Amino acid sequence: MSELAKFFIEVAEKWQRRWAEAKVFEPSPQPGRPKFFITAAYPYPNGTIHIGHGRTYLVADVMARFRRHLGYNVLFPMAFHYTGTPILTIAEVIAAGDKAVIEEYKEIYGVSDDDIKKMGDPLYLAQYFHRRSKEAMIKFGLGIDWSREFTTIDPEYQRFIQWQFEKLRKRGLIVRGRHPVGWCPRHQMPVGAHDTKDDKEPEIGQWTLIYFVDGEGLVYPTATLRPETVPGVTNIWINPDAEYVVAEFEGRKMVLSKDAAYRLSFQGNVKVIREARGREFVGRRVLNPVTGEWVPVYEAKFVDPKVGTGVVMSVPAHAPYDYAALRDMGEVKLIPLIRVEGYGEYPAKEVVERMGIKSQTDPALEEATREVYSAEYTRGVVREDVVDRIAPHLPEPARSMVRAVFKLYFAGRPVKEAREFISKWLAEAGLGGVMYDIMNKPVYCRCGTEIVVKVLEDQWFINYGERGWKQLARQLVEEMAIIPQEAKAQFLATIDWLDKRACARTRGLGTPLPWSQGWVIESLSDSTIYMAFYTVIKKIRALGLRPEQLTEEFWDYVFLGQGSAAEVAKRIGVDPAALEEIRREFDYWYPLDSRNSGKDLIPNHLTFFIFNHVAIFPREKWPRQIVANGWVLREGEKMSKSKRNVLPLDKAVALYGPDPLRATLAIAAEVEQDLDFRDAEARRNSQQLMSIYNLVQRLAQSAVEREETWLDKWLISEVAHVLERAREAYEKVRLRQAAVELLYNAEAVFSQYLSMVDKPSKSAVEAAKAWVVALEPIVPHFAEELWQILGGEGFAATAPWPKLSPDPAALLAKRYVDMLIEDVKNIPAYKAGAKRVAIYVNGNYQWLRAAVGKDVKAAIEAGAPPQLAKRLVDFAKSMGEEVRGLVERVEQFDEYAALQSYKRYVEKALGVPVDIYKADDPQAPDLGGKKKAALPLKPGIFIEVG
């Protein structure tokens, strides 16, 4: 631990104790006072939280602290998510003696051998990392109300979740049936993002299978995402070196890759008859079920047996990879199917040639494929003459009937419509089927097993596909604030594709499904409305309510206002006044004002949060805002356990100290951006905080009581502007912008001020107090220490947001002096070696005001001599926009007094003595005839060369 880190940790521990003693972050309802209720995603205690979690919690903490300064009654609570399989899986792996995982936990998290031995018990593991993570949050300086802490296996919480699920079931939003889910073959259970390594959500996609058949009746089920192109198939691809099987599936003998047969076995009954190499099937001919054409089976080593069925159809007119491969073989046959504006008959050929692709191994084929597929899907229309290729092998009248259907629903239709039609038609005609797959494979369970798709029977699902529910969810997304704004489109897209989702499992920690024994509600389903539970758990415990008293009637009254307090209280055996008190607590804090999480939770948790709120709560209790921050990298790389570069939050605090760490996580990127955490940046911010500390100490120790000068007024004005910009940044959750203003720009202003004055004034101390209050949300312990040094009363954390008024005249004086210094430095005589500088001030400021934005006549009418009027107007035009604006606002300005006030600053900047004269003073020497050259804010300058 460095000396700097030690200093910041000691400061932090002092103020953490004082906050806890004063219960600064434990609010109670205050009717009439505005409230701000913010939550961030509670963590899984299957490991210690890391700096990625720290960033999410920091954003929420900064928002909470800022609102407290604005006078809000702020609630920021925290809990721990024990539900699901992550904790159970890790405990099992450790109990089994998995050396890699054990070393990982010892190296990354610093777990002792004694604790490792006990972690075979899932509850011990959870409680260990719960404790470590909570300690890390406290050390990090999060202003959390720990009096409302709970875990998701607490009996009170389980009663709450059972109430939620009964509500969903009674509204028809929980169903039982057949549906594809991500599945761990080892644990024999559905999985979601929180059950997988790196929290990777298994993305389930659907292949259309098209049954090509050889002369022996063997089916070659091509798996495709583009079934509308089947009329243009010229051949089939099979990998000659891959392992295939002949297997029975859905009553047919099929050729499948061995891997595909394994994956399909979770979706239906697969019986492997024999194994074979792919080359056995190369050279055969198969019948296209749509066109009746016999097409060859070619070998292609680019076919991945782990994708689809390992059997691929080739459409060279519309697939760049197919075109390039067949061109290499000299076997190109092109059949046009889709018209796209801006492309010719054969889009794949056209794009391959335009991009200069020479072979089937060219990496540019990926880009070519994206271009063609995107253009055809978004703008493509199936050609009308495709009908002539349909079913020529069928006898009449079947041929005419099929062609009539294709003419109506396929030919001339947009690709999207044609795709939906032909997929359905193939299945209904028995010429195709469906295969589900993990489209973002490989995805691994935390136990190390690769996830597959299983079609479950009699599984419990939350039906996120229900249309009316989707519409309510869209309505909330459109109404609420979402930061960043561009994430709104991702929420709407997620709402569109969400369908049934498995909501219960047969193993793991959590809440039992209330109406079906043996099922446990899974982790992404019991974590959608728990924000409401924060508002009441403290009172439930304080009043000594038992879990069995927390009935459906209890929750209906507390959260929905249904029933009367007297009747409900009588039935559950509590005091009606106590019940009303709990209801008032919820009613005061809800709705949630901001929900904070990482952007990776948009496709699951955050969208489920929206769905469940609109399903259960009345409109006035719907959440108001979501903030989704970017990821955290470390030294340019994604953090992962395999790379051993995960930085636990408690280790980071020990390494840098909490406030330098907070400053770095705030300043390194705006909330919507991914943040690259770098050691050098953290150390630089640590040094910057020490510079601020030394500056404030110097200011506090040397300040004197005296009349305010131009310099004091300038300082206050600059700080007022910094605070104004910082406040706007905080309000927009632009933490980087706020941190730059407060950690660097403000420090530069104070440093310059101290360099300009002999002794700082007491008004400068008041300006520093204002700065410290604005700093507090980002570096709270450090701010408290500075607040104490400056003589602030109470806590900086609870001080109101400062009100400083900028003085335009003081700002004008400083800008004027800086312009003067620049003018002198640009004079050749000064560059040649100045010995002394004489400055002649024209005090007729009103002439310049009249000239700003006006003409010569206006300047003359204001009293300017005709011989100076044009120069005045030209000078007014040359002034920067800021100075021009200040001149328009400042009615009276004593240029001579301002310059005298800044004399020391000017002499220091120029490095020579400076004499200041009034241009109209007859007693003043007219060196070089510079009196008459003086204009308001542009004095005459004489330089004595040594």
Swiss-Prot record:
InterPro entries with a match to the protein in the record: aa-tRNA-synth_I_CS, aa-tRNA-synth_Ia, Leu-tRNA-lgase_arc, Leu-tRNA-synth_Ia_arc/euk, M/V/L/I-tRNA-synth_anticd-bd, Rossmann-like_a/b/a_fold, tRNAsynth_Ia_anticodon-bd, Val/Leu/Ile-tRNA-synth_edit
Keyword Nucleotide-binding: yes
Family that this chain belongs to: Belongs to the class-I aminoacyl-tRNA synthetase family.
Transmembrane portions of the chain: none
Motif 'KMSKS' region per UniProt: ranges: 638-642
Principal location class: cytoplasm
Gene Ontology MF terms in the entry: aminoacyl-tRNA deacylase activity; ATP binding; leucine-tRNA ligase activity
GO biological process: leucyl-tRNA aminoacylation
Source species of the chain: Pyrobaculum calidifontis (strain DSM 21063 / JCM 11548 / VA1)
EC number, as in UniProt: 6.1.1.4
Gene3D superfamilies in UniProt: Class I aminoacyl-tRNA synthetases (RS) (3.30.2320.20), HUPs (3.40.50.620), Isoleucyl-tRNA Synthetase, Domain 1 (1.10.730.10), leucyl-tRNA synthetase (1.10.10.720), Valyl/Leucyl/Isoleucyl-tRNA synthetase, editing domain (3.90.740.10)
Protein name in the entry: Leucine--tRNA ligase
Short name of one Pfam family: Anticodon_1
Subcellular location: Cytoplasm
Top EC class for this record: ligase
Binding site for ATP: 641
GO CC term (a single one): cytoplasm
Keyword tags: Aminoacyl-tRNA synthetase, ATP-binding, Cytoplasm, Ligase, Nucleotide-binding, Protein biosynthesis
PANTHER family according to UniProt: LEUCINE--TRNA LIGASE, CYTOPLASMIC (PTHR45794:SF1), LEUCYL-TRNA SYNTHETASE (PTHR45794)
SUPFAM superfamilies linked: Anticodon-binding domain of a subclass of class I aminoacyl-tRNA synthetases, Nucleotidylyl transferase, ValRS/IleRS/LeuRS editing domain
PROSITE patterns assigned to the protein according to its UniProt record, in alphabetical order: AA_TRNA_LIGASE_I (PS00178)
